[in-house]
């Protein structure tokens, strides 16, 4: 799976799902909202999109990613095979993708974060912890595993396998 960037198909599909259920089952509609409805950020990804990054400050993002992991695990189990690794992506998140997201700014304030990178670290921690509890290793591109504080690196290094991407993001 590719998160939080490269998620345009997910976002567009989940917006259609939201519109399908918003009037008949609002709770179901809200379950997988992976965007901040009040976000006014304008960004362009290296792929040329302005709508391809999951918002890491909304609960629907975590519910959705965990559901995908659960579904993958179920499919592997049905095939009689252990799911050993899930690659989370982590590369090519457009610079400034969350600049005007009230949800991001609220999360930063609530948690005492001073950098957006700390929200990305929170996301990596939450999802790799979820995978670890299931006995599944996490994989990610190098960007997801670099430039973190030493204590975070130690914590996550045992959970994540990293590889290089061709991203232009530093």
Regions found by a protein language model. Give the residues of each.
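Substrate-binding cleft/loops of secretory-pathway carbohydrate-active enzymes
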Residues: 8-18, 139-169
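Substrate-binding cleft of carbohydrate-active enzyme catalytic domains
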Residues: 1-134
